[in-house]
Structure formats: C-alpha cells, structure tokens
Amino acid sequence: MIGDMAHKYRNRNKEFTMANHLVIVESPAKVKTIKKFLGSNYEVDASGGHVRDLPKSQLGFDPEHDYEPKYITIRGKGDVLAKLRKEVKKADKIYLATDPDREGEAISWHLMKALKLDELKNKQVYRISFNEITKNAVKASLKSPRDLDINLVNAQQTRRMLDRMVGYRISPLLWAKVKRGLSAGRVQSVALRMICDREDEINAFIPEEYWNLDAMLNVAGSKKPLDAKYYGLANEEGAKGSKSAIHSKEELDVILKDLEGVSYVADEVKKGERIKKAPIPFTTSTLQQEASKALNFSTQKTMRIAQQLYEGVEVKGHGTIGLITYLRTDSTRVADEADAAARSFVKEHYGENYAAAGEASAKNTGKIQDAHEAIRPTDITLTPVMVKESLPRDLFRLYQLIWKRFTASRMAPAVYETTSVKIRAGKHMFTTSASRLSFDGFMSVYVASDDEEEKKQVIGAIESGMELKLADLQPSQHFTQPPAHYTEASLVKAMEEQGIGRPSTYAPTITTIIARRYVAKENKNLYVTELGEVVNRIMKKSFPSIVDLSFTANMETLLDRVADGTVAWKTIIRNFYPDLDEAVNIAQKELESVKIEDEVTDEVCDLCGRNMVVKYGPHGKFLACPGFPECRNTKPYLEKIGVPCPKCGKEVVRKKTKKGRLYYGCEANPDCDFMSWQKPSTEKCPKCGSYMVEKGNKLLCANETCGYRMDKPAEEQK
C-alpha cells in the first residue's frame, strides 16, 4: 500500500514538474521538429492553423456597432482547443510560437482569446517567433520572448474583414445573375481583371512587318563567317550612324540594291569588359517565379514544398531540421551570421577570389513587410549533395534551387570580355558583337532560367580599317509579336510590381481563380474563360474601385500602415464599407431590372422537339433542352460567325479548348480540320488569295509569308 502511494506521488510529481512549459505552434510537422530541440520539461502542441474565424453564414461584424468583429470557433477545432486547455492547466509558462508574420500573430491572438490566456493569474504567457526552425533559433527565441504585437493582429484582421465584405456582399449578385457558387474576392477580382486586360491587349494587337538582314562575312584566319546584322545608314564621318528598322520588302530591296558591289570595312572595333552581377536571394515572389520557370512548379506547389522544407525534414546524420528560412517574405535582407557563414563557405570551397566583396544584398524597399530575411538555407554547409538521399525528388529540387541562389548571392560577379564591331558597307552599316566568359564567378554555382545564352560566335583578329569579304546576304521576314499571355510566374511578378497582394496571397489568389474556372491554364499560359469574362464585366461595371489596380495597391499600403501602428484599423473599415454598401445597393437595383432570358436557338431537341436554349457550364456555353427536368438532352454549342470555312465551305464556328482558350474551327470537324486562333473574315487576300483574319480594325492575311494587310470596311470598324 505504501508502495502504491509512493507510485501515485511520483506520477503526480512527474506530471507537475516535467511539462511546465507549453509551446503552441500551428502544424504537427513543426511539433515533431521542435520537440527534438527542447528538454523533457517542454510540451509542444499544434493548433492546426486558425482556431477562430468570422462566421460563414453572416457578415461577421455589425456596421451599426462600429464594425466590432464577432469570432466563433471554427468547426472541428473544439477538440483541439479542449486538448490545449488541458495542456495549459499543466504549464507554468505558455509560449505562442506561430509563424513570424501577420497571419501567425493573428493565430496567436486568437489562441490567447480562445484559451483565455490573458485572464490567467498564475501563469506567464509569451509570444516567441523564429525565422528558421533550427535548435539555435528556437532556443534563442525562448531567451527573448515578447508580447503580442497588436498592430500586426489588427492588420490581419482588417484584411480579413475587407475580404469578407467584398465576398459576402458581391458574391450573391453573381449567384443571382450568372451561376451559383461563384465568388468575388478583393484581390482575386483584380488578378482576374489583369488577365482579362492582357487578353484584350493580345486580341487588339496588330502585327507589324519587319525584316532582318544578316551579312555573312569572311575574316582572314577564321573558319566560320562572321554574322553581322544590319544597323542602318552610316554617317558621312563614319560608323556612328543611325539605327533604323526595315519595315517592308520594298525597303529591303532598296537596301540590297545599294549594297551591290560595295566593300565591307571594319570602321570601329571596341574591346571591353562586362560585369554580370550575382543575383539577390529569393523572396516569395521570385522563388515562385523561378520555380515555375526552372522546375515547372505551380505557385501552390512551390509554397507547399517550401512549407515542408521550412517546418522540418529528417536528414541523415542531422536529425529533423528546418532546411530553409521562413517562406513568406518580400525581404532580401540576410542575417549577419548567415552572410558571414556563406562567404566563409565560398572561400573554402571555391577560392578567395570567388567570394563577394562588400554588400551583396539589395536594399529593402518601402513595401517590405516586417523584419523578415530572404529565403535561404538555414545551414549553408548542408549542400544539395549532402541532403539528396534524405529528400523526395521535388523537395530536393526546390532546396537545391534555394541553396544555389543564396550561395551565388554571396559570390563575386561573372566577367565577360566583349568585342563589338561596326562595319561600313557603302552608305549602310552593320554591327556584330561577341563575348567570352573570362571569370565565371557566381555562375560556377547558379544560372537563372531566364538568363540569355551568351553568343557563341568568335570575332577573329579584326582591326579598324580591315576589309571583310562578303560570303552571303541573308534577309528574313518577321512580324512583331503581341504581349505574352500571363503565366503564373509572370502574373506574380506583375502583381508584385503593381503592389497587388502580398507574399502570403499570391499563390492562394491564383489557385482560387483557376479553381473557380475564371481562368484556365494551358502550357503554362493563363487564359480567361467565358465565365471569367462575364464575372469581370460585372465587376468592372458595378464595382470599378474593387477591380482598380491603384485602389487595391493603395489598400495594401494602408494595411502596412496599420501593421506599423500609424493608421487605426477601424478608420479603413469605416471608410471602405459605406462606399461598398452603396455600390452593392445600386448594382442590385440595376441587375434586378435586367432579366437574363435563355437564348433560344434554331437547334431542335432530337428527343422532344423543343427549340434548345443556350446555358452556361463550367467550360462555357452549351445547348440544353428547355424541357428540363423531363428532358435532359444537351448538345455542344456551335456559335456560327457567318463565315464559310476556307477549306470545305461549311460554316466556321467559335469554340473553346478544354482549358477555355478561344479558337475558330469548322462545324464539320472532325471531317474538316480547319482551325484558326484569329477570327476568319469573308475577305480574300488580294495579294496571295488566302483567307484573311480580323485584328482590331485591320484585316491580315492568314498566310504569314505574305504579310498583306488592309483596313476593315468602314461599316465593320468599331
């Protein structure tokens, strides 16, 4: 009996003394990593992200009561909170160790409120944060705890309320007039507009003809001819000249006539040196862009994998460790210790002359949030080779990209020896250039995916005044290209440049507009769907400020000011909501007066004989029987454009790819394979007889080698 009492006492004593510190993080993955760094008197548990939010079924705050938000426990988080309350009872000190950003600060604040930590009398509650999940970083944060930063909490709360206002008030209008289940978002609507605007630019673009003229010149002592490109007319004094384009075959013929029998003389030879600077470390935006281009990762996949690398993975010989610093950042700053370690690593493994001299990082701009670092490896000595066996393929590829970029950022520039030559040919001038890598510097470790390959040609021993022998003149016809469709990478870059969104919002925004089928992705390119076009038209007409880029960018700036405590969060809400409320009320009245009737077609239902109507589906328009639900017959919608097929004479119809990209094909498909990305015209090219396509108020020959163009008839011009 005494033994039993002693056993119970030991258990009670163990329960009291061994878990008197509680660390709360967001994810179970972090729990696993951090537990290995701390002693047995630390309990580490996870909240699983947010535990409270605005209720889904209502706005979540009352404008009549000064917009005070009403938070409720998220469904499924009751058990999580119950478990955390038990752990809190056992602990003397509680550390809120959520992510080091506004979202993380807000999660800690909600945990404080949900667990009533601010009401505890005999326990100490702290906020700790760390930029990397390593033993040193976690232990250092425990030595320097702080209070919650209510300004960061308010900034996140304001963003959440603004997003709720837009979604809750505008989405029902889209349900009523377009399709149930659609959503309008404050940032996603702007991203959609950017894609729609780019599509409009592409559709309105009219290609301009131009010609290149290459002179292939033999140089004494060189096996390969030198490729020199036409530059323009030379000045009387010599090679300076004026650059001019060749706009047509007629202009080309005049130049070719001038060049008959002339000598080609090197008028100016310049030798020099070009410095290629090392890249700066990754931010969230640049990591997403480079991972898209180099690894073909979506923004969502990049963030998911980076999250795993940050939270911790098992590395042979090192245990569980966070391999990279925090992944949501727009800073290029690097901690002094990490900078020194990287430079030392470079000197040891590559040589003294490969290490960067002086400041290697770009200065942060006014948009930079909080005191974050750039994305970098937590330990530069953990090279990709050392961790390869421990990581799944995609984790390894992203880690390798981050490691190489950061290492390169601490290295010396690459150096090229350059030679440029200006060649006079009668009254015309040609130019050529070449470069040779003389010192690879950072390029021994890292070359960005979009770096242009250096010219491979070698310029021989050419001196000013030397005559070169013409081997061949090679003209080539080209046409200017429209702006490129956005990719995920280029959209993120454009959003960052315009100040739309922040590191934490880029990937979710793009994921949402694709998931909602407003945008489709095909071969990396983003195309707006018919559904996206309809939503964008409504947003631009009824809520112009919501989709205005400068308005949205200014709102991000105001949120930054809330975060630094210079603007009160309610000031933003009080200014925003009344204007939104008025716009919604006006839009409701306007849309109520617009009755959207089903478009009746001449197509007869082959099951019941009714005239079929046009409906909208996930992939655009289709034909449906109006007798639904008695008759459920549907057919593809073939929208005829009144133009005969250039191949077989049947009707050309407007179609969309599965990804939502518009094109024109023959109604007789698959028997006829005619297809065009541009809208065909009834006009024939007077020059070559091919069919013509519409581009704005112009008609262009579909035969690219022809290049003929003309104005549309006046009655067809917009």
Identify the residue ranges that each predicted region occupies:
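Core structural elements
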Residues: T158-R169, V187, L217-V219, R274-T286, ...
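Intrinsically disordered, low-complexity regulatory segments
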Residues: M1-R160, G232, K243-I246, D253, ...
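Basic, low-complexity terminal or inter-domain segments flanking catalytic cores
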Residues: A6, R12-K14, A19-L22, K32-T33, ...
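C-terminal helical "lid" subdomain and adjoining coupling/linker elements of P-loop NTPases
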Residues: K177-S183, C196-S248, A294
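Short helix-coil junctions and helix-kink-helix linkers
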Residues: T286-S298, V492-R502
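Alpha-helical scaffold elements adjacent to nucleotide-binding pockets in ATP/GTP-utilizing enzyme cores
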Residues: T33-F37, K83, A106-A114, A137-S141, ...
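C-terminal or mid-to-C-terminal helical accessory/interaction module adjacent to the motor/catalytic core
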Residues: I133-A215
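Metal- or metallocofactor-binding catalytic centers and their adjacent structured scaffolds
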Residues: E237-I280
